[in-house]
């Protein structure tokens, strides 16, 4: 088929094809109605961005409801992989506490921050960890995720970011509540 004169050309072609596959599999959004993913709205038209949803709908995640920002330090890719730095940081939040202020926990150069602009509502550690899980599902390292149920004077978010060498943990005032793991019916 094609003849290549050197390894560099083969590598370039491989990287080009690999990049196209990654773009198709991850970056191109799909419709939320998976039965009509490949059907255009009208004959000859393309699917518009208003009807697109991210790949994470297939995983039970809808980014249109709670938009995430996957930006952070340029060193964030170092937090991905086997060391699970960011999940270890946000799992330091205590599920059985109610958080009333700014908090930050760290692990292996990753900081997990809960912050509000305005008044701090009483938010359980379980709710905070759930928001971090959704952020980590999409961004896999650094990013910011805003809560959806805050009042009009408050905007709260969770944030994962690279923090070395300035990693500090800040524990806010908390109160306890009776947390129980949900009962599973399986």
From Swiss-Prot:
Keywords: Chromosome partition, Endoplasmic reticulum, Meiosis, Membrane, Signal-anchor, Sporulation, Transmembrane, Transmembrane helix. The chain crosses the membrane at residues 10-30. One of its GO terms (biological process) is sporulation resulting in formation of a cellular spore. Residues 31-186 are lumenal. Its main location: endoplasmic reticulum. It is found in: Endoplasmic reticulum membrane. Residues 1-9 are cytoplasmic. GO terms for cellular component: cytoplasm; endoplasmic reticulum; endoplasmic reticulum membrane. It comes from the Eukaryota. It holds the Pfam family MU117. It is a single-pass type II membrane protein. Required for correct meiotic chromosome segregation. Appears to also have role in sporulation. This is Meiotically up-regulated gene 117 protein.
């Amino acid at each position: 088929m094609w003849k290549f004169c050197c390894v560099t050309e083969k590598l370039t072609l491989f990287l080009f094809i690999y990049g196209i596959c990654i773009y198709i599999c991850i970056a191109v959004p799909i419709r939320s109605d998976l039965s009509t993913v490949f059907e255009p709205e009208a004959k000859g038209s393309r699917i518009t961005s208003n009807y697109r949803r991210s790949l994470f709908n297939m995983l039970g995640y809808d980014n249109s409801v709670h938009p995430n920002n996957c930006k952070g330090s340029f060193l964030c890719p170092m937090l991905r992989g086997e060391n699970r730095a960011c999940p270890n940081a946000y799992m330091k939040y205590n599920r059985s506490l109610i958080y009333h202020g700014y908090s930050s926990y760290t692990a292996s150069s990753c900081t997990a921050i809960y912050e509000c602009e305005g008044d701090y509502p009483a938010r359980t550690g379980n709710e905070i960890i759930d928001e971090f899980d959704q952020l980590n599902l999409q961004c896999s390292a650094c990013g910011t995720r805003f809560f959806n149920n805050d009042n009009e004077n408050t905007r709260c978010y969770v944030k994962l970011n690279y923090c070395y060498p300035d990693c500090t943990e800040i524990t806010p005032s908390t109160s306890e509540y009776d947390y129980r793991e949900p009962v599973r019916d399986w």
